[in-house]
């Protein structure tokens, strides 16, 4: 299946890609591994190779590579400019049980929400963990999504000014989850709702228009 055909199949509004399908041509990360992706070699205006977009709930997500002079690693960023309940973009060929995920993000616009987040242990569009920072509410939150329903584990007030770059990082091992924003740990929590390996990716909410760059992930 060609890349163009693959990307067209990924753009269903209520996409639920099972992890097994995402890993069909990939490799499992059994040993320590890390990678950083800057989107700088991908074509502007397209969904980057090896990524799958979708939404938990309803809506029309739109994840595209765009030029941005303010990008932490120039020249490109990955921008979510569509709208949906919870739009996500997942790196396929990844399967991490214990490790980390990190991204730089900038909240650009949104009247209902201005959020940037990361997902991990992603099984499909309805089952995963998510941590996000919100520029409208000025807080950092930790959730799990199960059977398509998002549940709050913890949220903490934190400064998240819009139109500025921030670094969101999550470290996870067994039940332990640590969420940091701009190098400061805001949440440490134990939870076991989503166990076992899963994919990693990025996440937004509602009408958030958010730019992402330097997406990093690794296994322990």
Model-predicted segments: where are they?
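Bacterial N-terminal signal peptides
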Residues: 16-29
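Short tryptophan-centered beta-strand motifs in secreted/extracellular beta-sheet-rich domains
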Residues: 39, 101-103, 164-179
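Secretory/extracellular carbohydrate-interaction modules
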Residues: 80-142, 146
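Short, aromatic/His-centered strand-loop micro-motif at the edge of beta-sheets
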Residues: 146-167
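Ligand-recognition surfaces built from glycine- and aromatic
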Residues: 194-220
């Amino acid at each position: 299946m060609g890349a163009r055909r693959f990307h067209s199949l990924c753009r269903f509004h209520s996409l639920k890609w099972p992890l097994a399908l995402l890993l069909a041509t990939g490799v499992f990360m059994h040993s320590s591994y890390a990678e950083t992706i800057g989107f700088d070699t991908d074509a502007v205006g397209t969904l980057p190779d090896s990524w799958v977009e979708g939404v938990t709930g309803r809506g029309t997500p739109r994840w595209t590579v765009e030029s941005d002079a303010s990008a932490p690693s120039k020249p490109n960023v990955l921008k979510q400019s569509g709208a949906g309940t919870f739009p996500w973009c997942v790196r396929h060929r990844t399967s991490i049980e214990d490790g980390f995920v990190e991204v730089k993000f900038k909240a650009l616009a949104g009247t209902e929400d201005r959020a940037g987040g990361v997902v991990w242990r992603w099984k499909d569009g309805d089952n995963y963990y998510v941590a996000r920072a919100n520029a409208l509410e000025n807080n950092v939150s930790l959730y799990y999504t199960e059977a398509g329903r998002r549940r709050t584990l913890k949220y903490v007030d934190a400064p998240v000014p819009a139109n500025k770059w921030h670094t969101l990082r999550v470290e996870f091992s067994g039940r332990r989850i640590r969420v940091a924003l701009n190098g400061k740990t805001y949440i440490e929590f134990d939870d076991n709702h989503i166990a076992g390996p899963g994919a990693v990716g990025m996440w937004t909410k509602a009408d958030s228009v958010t730019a992402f760059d330097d997406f990093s992930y690794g296994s322990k």
